[in-house]
Amino acid sequence: FQLQGNQGAACLFAGSPTDGLMGGGFLYTNENTLSLGLVCGLHHLHDAKKSVPQMLEDFKQHPAVAPLIAGGKLVEYSAHVVPEAGINMLPELVGDGVLIAGDA
């Protein structure tokens, strides 16, 4: 990636990683690893012709991605559901003697 010092790189992909569904893919550099993943709206997954794990495997074989991860090994696998409604969907996060913070 030709990075120096504390630099990092973020590569974003649209369309192809999620087989044409709303969403895309990402590749982020970390100090000694890469993070590779997909983003897809849950409400679109019922229209998917492939499972999410198959979409990820296909993404890993994409000509723009495969050379970047060649020789790498999987060290962690995770999935997250991320709300899309924005700040207006959040409940009150503070009250008498309580504060909710983080990924609660």
Model-derived segments and spans:
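FAD/FMN-dependent oxidoreductases across multiple families
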Residues: D19, H46-A104
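Active-site substrate-recognition segment that forms the wall
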Residues: A9-H43, E92-L93, I100-G102
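Central beta-strand plus flanking loop segment that forms part of the substrate or channel wall
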Residues: F1-A10, A64
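Residue-level signal for well-ordered alpha-helical segments
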Residues: Q4, C11-F13, L36, V75-Y77, ...
